[in-house]
């Protein structure tokens, strides 16, 4: 549909972790259907992330943490490996502050989310300082 002009070329489609995809085959299928980035299920192991990266060329979106309602886990110390294995990768940070998904964020919550971002950046700076930030689009 992009090639035919029905969808603008600069319209990006991001496959959400809520769709439940978590293997190389489904990642490749989503890419072939026009996905611009792929967000696998949140608790996926590093080995599976490496297999997904080998299967697709589009960026991978990864949650560094989650709200309590969807596991409540924090993976900050895995972030350097996320980058090494999955680049290009977009990190989704700050979710552990929320009680649930689609939760209204207060000013205090925004400050807590910013703190989570700073913590992830500190882990990257400490354990993978040679990581390169992607250009902004």
Language-model-detected regions and their locations in the chain:
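Active-site pocket-lining/capping segments in soluble small-molecule metabolic enzymes
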Residues: 1-18, 46-137
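Generic hydrophobic/aromatic pocket-lining and core-packing "Φ" positions
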Residues: 24-27, 49
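Conserved, mostly hydrophobic/aromatic
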Residues: 30
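Short beta->alpha connector loops at strand-helix junctions that form conserved
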Residues: 40-42
